[in-house]
């Protein structure tokens, strides 16, 4: 199963501000190379990383594919509205996969930091 942890901060306005994410594990939906859930999650994560890097000036640290952690991303500076939109889009995509295929393949949890 893919385990996803989304890190969030509460704001004075009552909205959550997503400030990082860790994605690890394998869905186990199909054999390696044919697992559409793993492929979809990977595509979302890589596109998010590249989009933050290219379209924003926000500071971040990120790693992909090291040991059992497939993707680890944390903002290291104030989060711009553009980056927050990209993060919201990533979380929405992951939640849609979880809703469509079930928690036996991907589980998303939110952690206050």
Language-model features: where?
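N-terminal intrinsically disordered, cationic/polar leader segments
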Residues: 1-36, 46, 50-113
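Short, conserved glycine- and acidic-residue-centered signature motifs
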Residues: 37-41
